[in-house]
Amino acid sequence: MKFSSVKVFLSLVFVCLFTFNLNGERGKSKRGKIKVACIGDSITFGARLEDPSADSYPAQLQKLLGKKYEVKNFGVGGCTLIRKGRPTVWNELSKIMEMNPDVVVISLGTNDTCGMGTCGNRKCWEYKDELESDYRDLVDTLQSLPSKPLIHICAPSPMVLETPGLDSARVEGLTVRKPRLQEIISIVKNLVQEKKVEFIDLNTPMDHKPELFTEKDGVHPNKEGYRAIAELVYQEISK
C-alpha cells in the first residue's frame, strides 16, 4: 500500500516538473529576442559613414548587445521631433509601432534647431513652443504600445565648433544653433522626470571632442563617434 502511494506521488511530481519545463520553454519561444527601436535623425541613420549598415550606432549597438537582442534603425536624415517639420518622426511612427519594441531609444532635436536664418529655408525653431507638447505626445504614443516598452530619451550629441575644416558660414550657423540644442535638452530632462522614462546623455560626454566628429561638419560623428554613442546607449540599456 505504501509502495503504491509512493509510486503515485513520484508520478505526480514527474508530471508537474515536465509541465513546468514545457511551459517555460513555450514562454521563452514566445518572448523571443528583445526588440530595440532606435528612433532619430541622420545621426541615428549613420550619415557620413561609408557603410551605415555596419557602423551606425544602432549597428554597433547590435554587436554590443549580442544575439538576444534585435536592434532596428529608424533613423531618417533631416528628421524633426516637431510635427510641422519636414521630414518628421510622426511620419515614421506607424513603422515603429508595427515593430512593437521592448526598448525604445529616442535621439531627436538636432534638426529642430534649424530655422530663423539657419539651415537655408528650413523652418523648425519658429515652432519651438510646440516642441515640449509634441515630445510628450510622442512618449505617450510609444508608452501605449502593447509591449509597454522601456523608453530612453537622449540628450542629442553635441555640435562641436572645434572640429577641423569648418568654414565661417558653418561656424556661424552652429554658433546660433548650439544654445538652442541646450534648450531642447532642458525640455528632455523635464520630460524624463514627468514621464518617468530613462535618460541617456549623449551631449556632455562628446562635447569639445572634435576627434569624434566628421571634418568640415561638426554635427555628424565619424566612425569612432558613432562607436561612442553605441557604447553610451549600451551602458544604459544593459543596466
Mark where each language-model region is.
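A short helix->loop->beta-strand "cap" motif at the edges of active sites that frequently abuts
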Residues: 145-150
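Conserved SGNH/GDSL esterase-like catalytic core that processes O-acyl groups on lipids
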Residues: 32-37, 43-136, 182, 220
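General small-molecule cofactor/ligand-binding pocket signal
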Residues: 72-74, 152, 198-200
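N-terminal secretory targeting modules
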Residues: 1-39, 43-55, 59-70, 98-100, ...
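Conserved beta-strand segments of the P-loop GTPase G domain that flank and frequently precede/overlap
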Residues: 107, 152-155
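Catalytic His-Asp segment of secreted/periplasmic serine-dependent ester chemistry enzymes
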Residues: 49, 116, 156-239
